[in-house]
Amino acid sequence: MKSNAVLLTALASALLSAAPAVALAQTQAASTTQANELGSPDKEFVQAASMSSSTEIDASKLASKQSQDKDVKNFAHHMMVDHTKLTLQLKMAAPHGVTVPKDNSDTAVLDSLKGLKGKEFDTAYIQKVGVEGHKQAVEAFQKEAQEGQNADLKKAAQKALPTIQQHLKMAQDLAAKKGVQ
């Protein structure tokens, strides 16, 4: 009997000591679920940023094949390297359970470039991908940096914004150098 009482006391003690851990686990699970539910502006940013980077990377691969201009090829290489890094940073900043699309390039932009070669390609690439693409990216990153609800995504946008702004300036300089309007 005495051993049953000791056993019951030990069991009750173990159950009571486990209760806070169970409550903590439930609280953590609830907060993880809340973190996974991004607000609309953050979801839009993840989509826009991943599409921008995917398009930059894919269009820059085209530029490395279809352009004959050294400056355009150098710009394209720079964009491939930087946007690969930016995509990785975005994936690391996204909350657990939020998928950053791997390859969601803007097919309309890519399709408009595929049939072009030489100077015709260079002009379209500089206009659509270099200048216009980076203007849109700057807007998306600025909006997230100012209005984002998810702290990690907001911080990632703030960190990446100077790079995106530098890309826009590089594209504008390249456009001026090549006489692209």
Protein language model regions, located:
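His/Met- and acidic-residue-enriched segments that coordinate or traffic transition-metal cofactors
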Residues: 2-10, 16-181
